[in-house]
Amino acid sequence: MQQRVIVGMSGGVDSSVSAALLLQQGYQVEGLFMKNWEEDDGTEYCTAMEDLADAQAVADKIGIKLHTANFAMEYWDRVFEHFLAEYAAGRTPNPDILCNKEIKFRAFLDHAMTLGADFIATGHYARRAETAYNSKGEAYAPLLRGLDKNKDQTYFLHAVHGREINKTLFPVGEIEKPEVRRIAEELDLATAKKKDSTGICFIGERRFNDFLKQYLPAQPGKIVLDNGKEVGEHHGLMYYTLGQRGGIGLGGMKGASEGAWFVLHKDVANNRLVVGQGHDHPLMQSTQLWSEAIDWVAGEQNIPAEGLRCTAKTRYRQPDQACTVFIDENSEHGVRVEFDEPQRAVTPGQSVVFYSDEVCLGGGVIHHTNAPTPNFI
């Protein structure tokens, strides 16, 4: 009997080709287009209608049914409110990670199961291993890096539990992006030459600062140098991220060298932005970080007393960094991570993701690091 797969179709080339490949592999395939954001300003920032039309055109071309579902309420409650709270606290969140965990691999998966699916599929560049069992006897599928290392998206999928991965197929995870484009052109799919989406879907083409301002009141404050000297005013700490180069408004400052300016530290308590010159400024360097809650793909991870040796990324596309992970005795589910080499601009609110060779073990949100605090704070 044919197994039924419902593909999350976004109107992009990766999910389009995923659906086509699954058909070729003999599955009974249907598509589902998710609407995760309600337009409220009457303008076409988000291309949701265009994306739906593209998904429908592909579904018609390959001869499959396309369902639609509205998860805007779930998105607001489970993703967007957290996104705003993190920015309000001076951190820099990554909503794509939470969206995958709560919407694409929870709300969508649950909905697909009510439609009678055996599996869901997405256009992510990732792979899964055969079903395994953790120490509690729970079935899960280990998450593996995508074959195309330049496009691998496991960083964004690390918070998805292995039991959900066990119900998911990743057709394009087994091939490289140029091949995906070639297949789409060969099949004459409407999305063959469509640009990859960038940015967060609910912001679309808007300037990020303008969007954020609609939801959080800006709190301007002082810009200070690494010695505490005031040199200007910032528009609100939420608009800046650690390690950011430029966009600070200090170009041509009297008495300063011609070098670029970088965000070194956010003094949230005093609403001050600390800046300085030098790509590898000491205030941006850390060798340890702490995360208060880790999502392990297997639902668990044995961490010996001497620590777990693995590699980690603290941002997407960063080369793997050798590290040791320890249980943090001061938090119920947290870890402390020691890196072999100093790390630059590790950012609270972003995620640290752990790997053992090809296997993505899981990860968590960075709470704080041991980067030095400016001595005037």
Swiss-Prot record:
Primary location: cytoplasm
EC numbers listed for it are: 2.8.1.13
Region annotation (Interaction with target base in tRNA) maps to 94-96
Disulfide pairs here are 99-201
Q: Which UniProt keywords apply?
A: ATP-binding, Cytoplasm, Disulfide bond, Nucleotide-binding, RNA-binding, Transferase, tRNA processing, tRNA-binding
Gene3D superfamilies under this entry? Adenine nucleotide alpha hydrolases-like domains (2.30.30.280), HUPs (3.40.50.620), Translation factors (2.40.30.10)
Q: Where in the cell is it found?
A: Cytoplasm
State the Gene Ontology BP annotations: tRNA wobble position uridine thiolation
Which is one Gene Ontology cellular component term of this protein?
Answer: cytoplasm
Give the span(s) annotated as Interaction with tRNA: 151-153, 315-316
Question: Which principal EC class is assigned to this enzyme?
Answer: transferase
Binding positions for ATP? 8-15, 34, 123
InterPro entries to which the protein is assigned, alphabetical: MnmA-like, MnmA-like_C, MnmA-like_central, MnmA-like_central_sf, Rossmann-like_a/b/a_fold
Q: Is Ligase found in the keyword set? A: no
Active site (record annotation) = 99, 201
Q: Does the keyword Disulfide bond apply?
A: yes
Which reaction is recorded as catalysed by this protein?
A: S-sulfanyl-L-cysteinyl-[protein] + uridine(34) in tRNA + AH2 + ATP = 2-thiouridine(34) in tRNA + L-cysteinyl-[protein] + A + AMP + diphosphate + H(+)
The UniProt family comment states: Belongs to the MnmA/TRMU family.
The protein's name is tRNA-specific 2-thiouridylase MnmA
